[in-house]
Regions:
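Catalytic-core helical/loop segments in enzymes performing group transfer/polymerization on anionic/lipid-linked
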Residues: 1-629
């Protein structure tokens, strides 16, 4: 610690800065990497707090937060007549982004509280380039570039602890960063496709309409089904089956609901069209008044301040204000249109992969007691973690949850034995994993070389965004961990390793570790960025450190697989027993490397198992869901 207790908190490395008159603390993997490359002594912010302490009561927090969402819903109903009359819970409908926002503020507040109490700084110099970014208070843009949480929170904490705060910014980064309005360009491109009828052609190919020579009166004949999240196999497969069973198929894409004909695709509902200006204006005024009164809601805001250990709700208020004044207004108008659409078109089922998308919120909220349709969610993410957030994303808003395998079915049946989730029935359709298994067996194995090929797939990483009920590895800790694993891989010259990353510089792994591997030019490490399933027939073994969907895909393909998981994260006990040696806990890189070493030296058969899949027909599944009430 420096004599005058001056600290440089480095979020973005600035080469012109003189770091010599204080202790340097790296806040991000990128900063840590740059400081190390420039041989500047530093520590990381993780040295000042305990992750285990922060996450120890997460299950209690989960249900406590659900109560907070309910209070928020009551507040909105008290001030917005449409929500009260139609019993619409708009806050809970947008659970995902609101939770990410609040949990991120709570996490960063915990980190800074640990730093201020343990470092006892007298002055802080925040080195960052996020000052040049225009703050956007949209809940659905918190994953994109914005002023960092450190930039937002540090003034509050410095005032609370009586610490002086200065900013150090690269002047070159302060230039006006103007980029094309991607949303506008995308909308214009979509209109262009609609005019050319190219979307009808894409639909004709995607859903294999060319195989449907005449309308069938199958088991789903005349049933109206609205599909969200099309364009991926698990949903497109169901769309095709619905076609061949005679259903009336509708698909949604952003501001449009399309009716899928035998050869063409036509617009059934355009959410952009204004129906009643007076209705829109009434909703806008009520939402504006609600947003104003939110500032006086001591109970809602006090809960946030208590969890953040400081007066942080003032920073979150602009996001909630934006949510009420913009998202709620837009949603209510769309909900009214969607509700009328369900009635006119006699929609029987809505099929999605989750409730966390922007479109899902109003589409699902539009279903009320006036409609006799079923809301169905097909599992989008498999996991062995005790991941409570999945219950909200995949179960809470639905009548049926369709799992991909028998193990997941058993897990969700146990976890939904709770008054909050008991209304949702758990069933299974293994069509995705069964198709993956069949496809994998048909593919010829990659020609084996003299050395075994092992693919290592790190978990997806989100820069600076937290969900306290989803296991997320801390970026700074995880970056150092991955560097140690890469060091081990390069020493194992008897093997060839594929380091799988995301394309297009998705996160800090691509910005920090991919250049690191390329710079070192390791002879036995290759970088690949295609989906994991495209490598299943090309590799001898698979190593993961986050047992979710990729783990299940590898297991069903019968590829010898080892998945590590951080030991302080809870996993389902039955999954631990079922997968046996294929799941191994670790606390640090040394322990993880030990597990990998034993895996590479062991008989492959010890790391292969048969994932139970119950075969079922999609049409039968829908019929059972309809008649069961």
């Amino acid at each position: 610690m420096s004599v005058n207790n001056t600290y440089y908190l480095v979020e973005t490395y600035v080469s012109q800065c003189d770091y010599s008159d204080g202790e340097v603390i790296a806040l991000t993997p990128e900063a840590c990497d740059k400081l190390a490359n420039n041989r500047i002594p530093h520590r990381v912010i993780n040295d000042f707090f305990s992750e285990e302490e922060h996450t120890k009561d997460n299950s209690v927090y989960f249900f406590d937060q659900i109560k907070w969402f309910k209070q928020f819903d009551v507040f909105l109903k008290n001030h917005i007549d449409y929500c009260r009359v139609n019993d619409i819970d708009l806050a809970t409908a947008h659970y995902d982004p609101i939770k990410f926002l609040i949990d991120s503020y709570i996490t960063y507040s915990f980190i800074l509280t640990g730093f201020f109490k343990n470092a006892v700084p007298s002055s802080i110099k925040l080195v960052t380039d996020s000052l040049c970014l225009r703050q956007d208070y949209s809940l659905y843009k918190i994953f994109r570039l914005q002023k960092s949480f450190y930039t937002q929170l540090l003034p509050t904490f410095c005032q609370q602890y009586g610490v002086t705060l200065q900013y150090v910014t690269d002047k070159d980064s302060l230039s006006d960063l103007r980029t094309p309005n991607k949303g506008m360009l995308k909308a214009r491109f979509k209109d262009f496709l609609l005019r050319l009828q190219l979307k009808s052609l894409l639909s004709f190919i995607r859903y294999r309409k060319y195989l449907l020579f005449k309308q069938r009166k199958g088991r789903l004949y005349s049933k109206g089904i609205l599909f969200l999240h099309t364009g991926i196999y698990p949903i497109d497969f169901i769309v095709r089956r619905a076609f061949f069973e005679g259903a009336r198929v509708f698909t949604m894409s952003e501001d449009f609901i399309f009716q899928e004909g035998r050869y063409t695709q036509s617009i059934a509902l355009d959410f952009r069209k204004t129906v009643s200006n007076s209705f829109n204006e009434t909703i806008r005024k009520e939402c504006m008044q609600a947003a104003h009164k939110l500032k006086q809601q001591d109970g809602l805001l006090a809960w946030i301040d208590e969890k953040c250990q400081g007066n942080v709700s003032t920073l979150i208020l602009p996001y909630l204000d934006n949510f009420i004044n913009h998202v709620c207004v837009e949603d209510i108008v769309k909900i009214d249109k969607a509700s009328d659409f369900y009635r006119k078109e006699k929609i029987d089922f809505i099929v999605t992969r989750c409730s966390s998308g922007r479109d899902s919120a109003f589409i699902l909220s539009a279903v009320n007691t006036k409609h006799r349709l079923k809301k169905i969610c097909f599992q989008h993410a498999s996991t062995v973690f005790e991941q409570l957030s999945l219950l909200m994303y995949d179960v809470y808003f639905f009548d049926y949850y369709v799992t991909t395998d028998s193990l997941s079915e058993k897990y969700f049946k146990i976890r939904t034995n709770n008054e909050v989730f008991r209304h949702c029935k758990i069933v299974q359709s293994s069509h995705y994993l069964s198709a993956l298994k069949s496809s994998h067996l048909k593919k010829s194995r990659w020609l084996k070389g003299a050395k075994e090929t092992i693919i290592y797939a790190p978990c997806d990483t989100l820069r600076g965004i937290y969900n306290l009920n989803t296991p997320l590895y801390d970026p700074n800790w995880y970056c150092n961990y991955l560097k140690e694993l890469i060091g081990y891989f390069c020493e194992r010259r008897d093997k060839i390793f594929i380091f799988k990353c995301r394309p297009l510089g998705f996160g800090w792994v691509e910005r920090v570790l991919v250049p690191y591997i390329k710079l070192k030019n390791f002879a036995n490490i290759r970088i690949e960025n295609k989906p994991l399933i495209s490598y299943l027939h090309r590799v001898d073994r698979i190593v993961l450190d986050y047992p979710t969907t990729g783990f299940y895909e590898s297991v069903v393909a019968k590829v010898p697989t080892l998945s590590l998981y951080k030991g302080n994260y809870l996993i389902w006990e039955e999954a631990r027993k079922f997968f046996g040696p294929m799941l191994q806990p670790f606390t640090d890189a040394k322990e993880a490397i030990g597990h990998i070493d034993r895996f590479l030296a062991s008989d492959k058969k010890k790391y292969v198992t048969e994932l139970p899949l119950a075969q079922s027909d999609i049409a039968d599944l829908f019929h059972r869901m309809e008649v069961s009430g």
